[in-house]
Design a protein with these regions (language model features):
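Acidic, PIN/NYN-like endoribonuclease modules and their adjacent C-terminal/linker elements
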Residues: 1, 101, 105-134
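Short, well-structured N-terminal submotif of metal-dependent ribonuclease cores
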Residues: 1-35, 47-63, 133-134
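Generic structural signal for small/hydrophobic residues in well-ordered secondary structure
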Residues: 6-7, 21, 43, 81, ...
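Alpha-helix capping/helix-boundary segments
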Residues: 9-10, 39, 77, 100, ...
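Substrate-recognition element of Asp-dependent hydrolases with the DxDx(T/V) motif
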Residues: 33-40, 114
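Short, structured coil segments at secondary-structure junctions
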Residues: 64-66, 123
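Active-site neighborhoods of divalent-metal-dependent phosphate/nucleic-acid chemistry enzymes
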Residues: 68-112
Length: 134
């Protein structure tokens, strides 16, 4: 099974907390976890905004993307976005989350997030939460 890591899960990996996220990631075969280019964009934006520890965080993010492939957003993702946006007409939902959901659906992977509620009701989207203590 392949997994797409939501932005919050990537942040947990970078911060090395909570430990259960790191443990679950460690159980996967190489290449089983991927990141959407949308999550990478969110991480880059966060890095640009902050001033403290900038050089260190640049290195950590570079290490993360060297180990977790960043998938490009394709026409298939755009088509999935249209379907999901039409299915869930709540325009208050975050567009970035909708793009990540569409990307996961279009690539046939399970989305890993700690924000389950943000991704409910999207048709065809499979979600797991590795941050829960189980």
């Amino acid at each position: 099974m392949r997994y797409m890591l939501d932005t919050n899960i990537c942040i947990y990996i970078i911060k090395r907390h909570p430990p259960q996220v790191l443990h679950r990631l460690a159980t996967l075969a190489q290449g089983s976890a991927v990141m959407s280019v949308v999550s990478y964009a969110e991480l880059r934006a966060g890095l640009e905004i902050q001033t403290a520890n900038r050089a260190q965080d640049e290195r950590v993010l570079a290490l993360l993307i060297s180990r977790i492939p960043v998938l490009p957003f394709t026409e298939s993702g755009a088509e999935s976005f249209g379907v999901l946006r039409a299915a869930v007409r709540d325009r208050r939902r975050d567009t970035m989350d909708q793009l990540i959901a569409a990307h996961a659906v279009s690539t046939g992977v399970t989305l890993v997030t700690n924000n389950d509620a943000d991704f409910k009701d999207y048709p065809g989207l499979k979600v797991e939460n590795w941050a829960l203590n189980t």
